[in-house]
Structures are given as C-alpha cells and as structure tokens.
C-alpha cells in the first residue's frame, strides 16, 4: 500500500541504473544498520545478511575481472559515494581489498604513466577527464557512461 500511495515512480533510471552492488552506495551502509536491528529484535529473517553476501560476491567477481588483465589497477573514487569523504562501507574499497587479496597492485586516484586497468567506480566522467589513462590502458565502466573503448562490466554490458 505504501508504494501504491507513493507519487514518485520507482520504475525509472533513477532507481534502475548500472553501478555498484545492491542498488547504490548508500544501501550497504543501510544494510549494516538494518542487519544490526534485525539481530537486536531477534527477527528470524536473514534477508539483509543475504543481500550483504550478494554484494560481497559481486565485489569479488568484479575484482577477479579487474585482476584478469594482469596490469596495475587504479580505482577512481574511494569514498562510499560520490561527493563525500566517508569511506566506511565503500564498494570501491571492498573491490580494492579483494584485488589486493588476489595479488594485484591497486591505487586510488593515482596517475600512472604505464598501461593499467582503470575502474570508474563513480558515475562521473570528470574523474576520467582528470585522469588521463596511458595508452593501452583498460577502462572498466560500471555505469555504462558510453566512454569510447571502455569495457562495461555487469548486467548492463553492451
């Protein structure tokens, strides 16, 4: 009933867009709080725990994809969402930790003058404009922003 009464259309690109795990950057932080609350209230549902696990599984799959290029990895965007300095709950850091665990060298927002895999972790072309990847670099675009020659990863690959 609540969704039917809502005037905003949830079936739009505002909600259904490519990007990081389970709906966007804020959802993991919300999931931590809601998981704690369900535990405190002794609720039987493990839905939020399962959602968190799926997010981690997706991050590991993305890390394996990035590492498969056998190049240093640069992640553009370290905060948990664009425009803030907070990194707690950051999908970028989670992916970076998995990359490190898999033996890759990772950097955040650093410029290399040699080919690298560049993960565009936030939907902001200006991050990529600020960083000019070396020739033969591989750009992995989570957001399918239409960046020429970029590899798009996930369900929304073209």
Task: List each language-model region with its residue ranges.
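Structural/interface elements that position substrates and couple domains in central-metabolism enzymes
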Residues: 1-158
């Amino acid at each position: 009933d609540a969704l039917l009464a809502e005037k905003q259309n949830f079936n739009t690109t505002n909600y259904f867009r490519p990007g990081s795990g389970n709906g966007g950057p804020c959802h993991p932080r919300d999931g931590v709080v809601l998981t704690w609350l369900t535990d405190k209230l002794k609720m039987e549902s493990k839905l939020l725990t399962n959602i968190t696990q799926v997010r981690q599984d997706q991050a590991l799959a993305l890390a394996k994809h990035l590492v498969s290029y056998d190049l240093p990895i640069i992640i553009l965007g370290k905060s948990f969402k664009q425009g803030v300095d907070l990194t707690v709950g950051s999908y970028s850091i989670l992916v970076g930790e998995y990359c490190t665990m898999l033996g890759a060298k990772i950097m955040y927002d650093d410029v290399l003058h040699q080919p690298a895999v560049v993960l565009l972790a936030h939907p902001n072309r200006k991050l990529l404009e600020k960083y000019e990847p070396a020739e033969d670099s591989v750009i992995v675009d989570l957001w399918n922003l239409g960046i020429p020659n970029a590899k798009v990863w996930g369900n929304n690959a073209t």
